[in-house]
Amino acid sequence: MAIPKVGINGFGRIGRIVLRNAILTGKIQVVAVNDPFIDLDYMAYMFKYDSTHGRFEGSVETKGGKLVIDGHSIDVHNERDPANIKWSASGAEYVIESTGVFTTKETASAHLKGGAKRVIISAPSKDAPMFVVGVNLEKFNPSEKVISNASCTTNCLAPLAKVINDTFGIEEGLMTTVHATTATQKTVDGPSKKDWRGGRGASANIIPSSTGAAKAVGKVIPALNGKLTGMAFRVPTPDVSVVDLTVKLAKPTNYEDIKAAIKAASEGPMKGVLGYTEDSVVSTDFCGDNHSSIFDASAGIQLSPQFVKLVSWYDNEWGYSHRVVDLVAYTASKD
């Protein structure tokens, strides 16, 4: 099968790290990038240098109005309206929508006007079908033109929840994600009309926040619909987050059996998506980890045979972007 040719709309944290993952894996070929707020020279600089993931090891240059990475030319567009981006002129059949702005079927489908065959939204969507690699890809229908890769937190939680529900059954559960700082937060206190706490300085505070990640699991695993909800704490770290899933199980069990089930999944059907560790790890140990979710066996606790707290780490930038690449490649293989 030919390598899928892809365009990226939005060259922010996810857009740039998706491009790094595309180059490193070779699963997709990025042929065009659109961002109305970043000119070509600045685009090259932002891709080459990264405070979290380090300097890009290959060559990065600009030539003839194009971004050239490791000798591969990428067309650059600066359109504000997605409908005006001529993806077909660059040969891009699939578009990764990573602005964080066009997250509905209607708005994201504007890319189809420029010649895209399918749009993959790198964020949760209110109405586009959501897919989590390792969890519900078998539900994908090639007729779907706009799909979502869900959120980084849903990608961490869903594989873990699937293993636990399939093996022991989940009656109900609460999730907390202790989440690294993201670009929407403020460096110092500033206005944030809809979320007053979210306007407080990111580096000075632990900030309680809402998240739809747990409820979204019910969309990708229908058996868990209405059984999970959750919240977030935004913390002053640059990257890597951790999910705390506390559940009431349908079947009584012990923690050793829970560990064994997750370990088996991590070495079998969810290999590469769900990781497993018994080491005494901390957040920075997972920076640049390709997994969606890495279960921390020594961090979880059990109160009773049916009540347990499970802990799983994720690089909310790198691991998620790796899955975006996987999802694009998978959907292209079905066309």
From Swiss-Prot:
Enzyme nomenclature, EC number: 1.2.1.12
UniProt xrefs under Pfam families: Gp_dh_C (PF02800), Gp_dh_N (PF00044)
Modified residues (Phosphoserine): 125, 151, 192, 203, 209, 241
Modified residues (Phosphothreonine): 153-154, 182, 184, 211, 237
CDD domains from the UniProt entry: GAPDH_I_C (cd18126), GAPDH_I_N (cd05214)
Keywords noted in UniProt: Cytoplasm, Glycolysis, NAD, Oxidoreductase, Phosphoprotein
Pathway named in the protein's UniProt entry: Carbohydrate degradation; glycolysis; pyruvate from D-glyceraldehyde 3-phosphate: step 1/5
Binding residues for NAD(+): 13-14, 35, 80, 316
Catalysed transformations (reactions): D-glyceraldehyde 3-phosphate + phosphate + NAD(+) = (2R)-3-phospho-glyceroyl phosphate + NADH + H(+)
Superkingdom of this protein's organism: Eukaryota
Keyword Transmembrane helix among record annotations: no
Residues given in the record as D-glyceraldehyde 3-phosphate binding sites: 151-153, 182, 211-212, 234
Protein name, UniProt field: Glyceraldehyde-3-phosphate dehydrogenase 2
The organism of origin for this protein: Schizosaccharomyces pombe (strain 972 / ATCC 24843)
Name of encoding gene: gpd3
